[in-house]
């Protein structure tokens, strides 16, 4: 076994320590009062204890970390392009896409709280070796793809804030250091880490709200855009993009692990229900805030660039320049305000990416090693290819936009491999006990999953029909599509037919 200089092993012996999302000493203690203890017998048969603002505060955190994936640079690029091309007309879709994302994330939280295990761990037990290895590789590829977008977003912001002195590759290296910031903060407890994310989300909110105020969008058009569904052939591609970038595969794995950072007695059914209630409230609040931030970005670009010659050429790389030309400087130049918001989005999403990478690797492989080493490995998987990308494409905006399209495709491909296992697992009484989802919830969840998968399938079909030509490439895409579809059908069929689970969520009635 590899050793450190002080003889502390890098890899943890499997017999010494079982792989878990959080050690008991790392979890946030939920304070119980005496009055509630007196009610334990009564509420144990009937639902959760009375609502408490103090408890809501203690449970607040995982939902906001989860919401970062709704605010990453990839989503911001989707927002600005939707606003520039479609104006206010897709705001209703942004709202409903966020609602669909909320439903998926609540299922992820439900799985984590009811079982005490996260999605990657459960997939390790649910599927045979070959299938779980495919799922692991797919999850890692999705994570690397999103991380490249996030790191490049931060690097673009750093380049703007340094007035071009620091090139993209230097920004990538600086962003890579967030791994060590993350490790430092994690050593001081999960609440400290959550506080940092609260600051980053607040920074995004203030920055983009300031831009919203500067742009002075039409209130009536904004309201109509939210309340009146409207879709045209000209905006269909952007509409598909809005829905496609809302659900991030790694975020589904992440949230099921984050909710285990609170101390919940899974032997008591009402304690589990209490935790689910508070997580539902805080996740809803977090995603409502993310919706507002996305709305700010969309409306700023709708106001400034809709029906202009620049509408189809705006991307993450040149957005700051176009904003500056449109809205000017002033005391606080909008270029730098945009860069500050973009930097907060990039930094927060890269840290959550590192976090998700630890859970994915540890869960699928039952790979028990020191947290700092595992974070370093998962970070390197994304940073090394990103540095190469930044060195090659530093001065090529068009090439970076093409790369971004390919990365979106990469993540779209992975979505079924997070959604289908999640829905299959939360539907099984052998795993969830009394917390399995009911028929109505199950039907709605599968309809949402089917809609998201079909939308992303449309994106893939359109992309490959435009980008791929020649017999060899067409043959390869055909073979890949057949294998891809077969594996999805396998996951669905196994989820319906496979039930030999000895494990069950513990809950007293």
From Swiss-Prot:
Superkingdom of origin organism: Eukaryota
Principal location class: membrane
GO CC, alphabetical: Golgi apparatus; plant-type vacuole; plasmodesma; vacuolar membrane; vacuole
GO molecular function: metal ion transmembrane transporter activity
Tissue: Expressed in vascular tissues.
Observed effect of gene inactivation: No visible phenotype under normal growth condition, but slightly enhanced resistance of root growth in presence of Cd and increased accumulation of Mn and Zn under Fe starvation.
Transmembrane regions listed in the UniProt entry: 56-76, 84-104, 133-153, 165-185, 193-213, 239-259, 285-305, 327-347, 383-403, 406-426, 444-464, 472-492
Membrane topology note: Multi-pass membrane protein
Region (Disordered): 1-25
Assigned keywords, A-Z: Ion transport, Iron, Iron transport, Membrane, Transmembrane, Transmembrane helix, Transport, Vacuole
Function: Vacuolar metal transporter involved in intracellular metal homeostasis. Can transport iron (Fe), manganese (Mn) and cadmium (Cd). Regulates metal accumulation under Fe starvation. Acts redundantly with NRAMP4 to mobilize vacuolar Fe and provide sufficient Fe during seed germination. In association with NRAMP4, required for optimal growth and photosynthesis under Mn deficiency. Exports Mn from vacuoles in leaf mesophyll cells, making Mn available for functional photosystem II in chloroplasts. Involved in basal resistance to the bacterial pathogen E.chrysanthemi.
Family under the similarity heading: Belongs to the NRAMP (TC 2.A.55) family.
The protein, known as: Metal transporter Nramp3
Organism per entry: Arabidopsis thaliana
């Amino acid at each position: 076994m590899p050793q450190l200089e002080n003889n502390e092993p890098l890899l943890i012996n499997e017999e010494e320590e079982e792989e878990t999302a959080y050690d008991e000493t790392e979890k946030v203690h939920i304070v119980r009062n005496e009055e509630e203890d007196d009610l334990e017998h009564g509420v144990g048969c009937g639902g959760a204890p009375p609502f408490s603002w103090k408890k809501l505060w203690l449970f607040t955190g995982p939902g906001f970390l989860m919401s970062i994936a709704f605010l990453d640079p990839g989503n911001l690029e989707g927002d600005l392009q939707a606003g520039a091309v479609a104006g206010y007309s897709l705001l209703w879709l942004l709202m409903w896409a966020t609602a669909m994302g909320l439903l998926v994330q609540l299922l992820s939280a439900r799985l984590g709280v009811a079982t005490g295990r996260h999605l990657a761990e459960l997939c390790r037990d649910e599927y045979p070796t070959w299938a779980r290895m495919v799922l692991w590789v797919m999850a890692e590829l999705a994570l690397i793809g999103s991380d490249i977008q996030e790191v490049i977003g931060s690097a673009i912001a750093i380049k703007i804030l340094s007035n071009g002195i620091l090139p993209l590759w230097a920004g990538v290296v600086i962003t890579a250091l967030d791994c060590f910031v993350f490790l430092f903060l994690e050593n001081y407890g999960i609440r400290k880490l959550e506080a940092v994310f609260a600051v980053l989300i607040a920074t995004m909110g203030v920055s983009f709200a300031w831009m919203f105020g500067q742009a002075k969008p039409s209130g009536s058009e904004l309201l109509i855009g939210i309340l009146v569904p409207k879709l045209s052939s000209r905006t269909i591609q952007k509409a598909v993009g809005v829905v496609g970038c809302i659900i991030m595969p790694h975020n589904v794995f992440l949230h099921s692990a984050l909710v285990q950072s609170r101390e919940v007695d899974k032997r008591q059914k009402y304690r589990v229900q209490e935790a689910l209630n508070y997580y539902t409230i805080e996740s809803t609040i977090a995603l409502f805030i993310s919706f507002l931030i996305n709305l700010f970005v969309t409306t700023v670009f709708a106001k400034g660039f809709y029906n202009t010659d620049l509408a189809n050429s705006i991307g993450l790389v040149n957005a700051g320049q176009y904003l500056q030309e449109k809205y000017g400087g002033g005391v606080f130049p909008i270029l730098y305000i945009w860069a500050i918001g973009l930097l907060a989005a990039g930094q927060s999403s890269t840290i959550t990416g590192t976090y998700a990478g630890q859970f994915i690797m540890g869960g699928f492989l039952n790979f028990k090693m020191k947290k700092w080493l595992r974070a370093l490995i998962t970070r390197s998987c994304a940073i090394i290819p990103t540095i190469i990308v930044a060195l090659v494409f530093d001065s090529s905006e068009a090439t970076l936009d093409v790369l971004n399209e390919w990365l979106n495709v990469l993540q779209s491909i992975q979505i079924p491999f997070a959604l289908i296992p999640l829905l299959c697992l939360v539907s099984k009484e052998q795993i969830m006990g009394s917390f399995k989802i009911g028929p109505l919830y199950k039907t709605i969840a599968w309809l949402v999953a089917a809609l998201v998968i079909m939308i992303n399938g449309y994106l893939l079909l359109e992309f490959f029909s435009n980008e791929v030509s020649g017999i060899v490439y067409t043959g390869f895409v055909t073979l890949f599509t057949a294998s891809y579809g077969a594996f999805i059908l396998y996951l669905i069929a196994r989820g319906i037919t496979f039930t030999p689970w000895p494990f069950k969520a513990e809950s007293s009635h």
